[in-house]
């Protein structure tokens, strides 16, 4: 996808005025398993799951999927807002290292024992980095359509996304009390970004009401719309850092933590170079292909949920087999131990 150079030029003038914090306190939603017919299926996940959204997403981006997965796997699912997203505080730096630090801190602070991670796009890269840097904290990961590589080719897309959000708030003139604010905001986005599915994904950031938890980005004039992300301050950091990957820091780092990679068939993210990069860092990875674009979770929710459910079931079967083998080996050791002889001592 190609966007005009004017969009990139406008974005480069973004000012930075957000505070710097080592750890952001992550807002989250918790989805607990509910009674359903899924209970009759053999899908179980012994550990809780944390879901990580994509860029300009938030904790409710795929909320119906979270509940389905929680029911299917009989495990709680935490869906978090990353820093500067949803209801989590606005702060810098916006780098993968900072996001991974926030995630580790969230796991430790909430005493979540060895969770598995499911990450989409930006969240997929974050999941891989967290597992590589802190493998002792995580059980496994599901990586939705991304790979551990630098991706400068996506910078024009990210530029267009940022400009679409910014123009819909600061240049559209649409008022929050306008009953047609949704359609008007979407029309503004279309003039800046030609990716219609992405625009629908981005639109949830535009709101007619402020938040009680954090300061939303808005025009100073009365009755203007709000944006959940601090778009003017954050845009340049997104374009610079989201395509990145800390290759130098992770040179030679490899883990046996298992991951499933969900490849969207037409997105081009999981290519040959990406598969080679996966093999450098993960000794136990599986790739499953689902028909669709990068937004495959929106386009084919049941297919990806089924693929994730099957993979967790297979992982649990492996764990059960390993435990059975270990128990059998231990029992054999016990039976092979010599019986201690003793002499009867008579007391006069």
UniProtKB/Swiss-Prot annotation:
Reaction(s) this enzyme catalyzes, per UniProt: ethanol + acetyl-CoA = ethyl acetate + CoA; acetyl-CoA + H2O = acetate + CoA + H(+); ethyl acetate + H2O = ethanol + acetate + H(+)
GO cellular component: mitochondrion
Any single Pfam family the record assigns to this protein: Abhydrolase_1
Major site of localization recorded for this protein: mitochondrion
Keyword hit for Amino-acid biosynthesis: no
Active site positions: 121, 145, 294
Annotated compartments: Mitochondrion
GO molecular function: acetyl-CoA hydrolase activity; carboxylic ester hydrolase activity; transferase activity
Transit peptide: 1-19
Domain AB hydrolase-1: 49-305
Keyword Hydrolase: yes
Keywords, alphabetical: Hydrolase, Mitochondrion, Transferase, Transit peptide
EC number: 2.3.1.268, 3.1.2.1, 3.1.1.-
Similarity-based family: Belongs to the AB hydrolase superfamily.
Function: Alcohol acetyltransferase that catalyzes the synthesis of ethyl acetate from ethanol and acetyl-CoA. Can also function as a thioesterase by hydrolyzing acetyl-CoA in the absence of ethanol, as well as esterase hydrolyzing ethyl acetate.
Name of the featured protein: Ethanol acetyltransferase 2
Native source species: Hanseniaspora uvarum (Yeast)
